[in-house]
Amino acid sequence: MINVGIVGCGFVGGALKVWLEKNNSEVIVLVSDPPKGYNDDLSKADIVFLQIHVPTEDDGTQDLTLMKELIKGLPDVPVFIRTTILPGTSEKLSKETGHKVYFMPEFLTERTHIQDFETQPMVFTGELDLLAQIFVGKTFCYMTSLEAEITKYAHNVFGAVKVTYFNAIADYCRRLGAEYKRVHAGCLLSGYINDTHTYVPGPDGKFGYGGKCFPKDVNAFAELTKDIPLGKLLAPLHELNVGFRGFEERI
């Protein structure tokens, strides 16, 4: 049996817990999240998955104080961080805590997190033999933790870019008296463009992007890359989104 520790049982940790309990009878799931009533002892864990809130400031910095404290208090086993962290953070945490720290990105949507975890492939960044025993039957791709950290930001920020682009197209249609729904349908005809993040307004009934992830990830990534071409591409996103997000208040 493999003892799998889960620190933080929000929708990310919760989806992992549900999948393991449903799909792998050779795993014992140990959960630590006192506010939610989970107080399992992680001292016998063979591996730990860590998903906690990490504050991201407007200047792109992250407060890793709590994460460091939690890692230092864990047994000497591989630790996989599933919280979005800036590129290079897992290597930094490995050096500062003395633990083997990896990053394993997640691409779950909060309202469909259980289904998403069930169907999505995974990214493995280390301890392949152990992960293969835990995630039996899961399709995965391998990369370094640094590459995975970049992947997570590239994925999330592209979603924000796509939302912003199609909001700009919808704005252009309004200005010219064209029907955005028809333009939107025409853009999807070739099959080259996936319809995700192309609806205006979005699933929340609002213009622009919102939620817990896109705003903080855009701001952090734009600040981190401000002196290179990528940052120049991302710099206008926040201001544009503020304008689109407030559009429903003006109509």
Residue ranges and their predicted role:
Residues 149, 164-251:
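Interdomain hinge/lid region at the active-site interface
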Residues 30-34, 102-106, 143-145, 186, ...:
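Conserved beta-strand termini and adjacent loop/short-helix elements that scaffold enzyme active sites
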Residues 40-41, 114-118, 199-206:
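Solvent-exposed alpha-helices and their adjacent loops that cap or buttress functional pockets
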Residues 1-43:
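NAD(P)+-binding Rossmann beta1-loop-alpha1 motif at the extreme N-terminus of oxidoreductases
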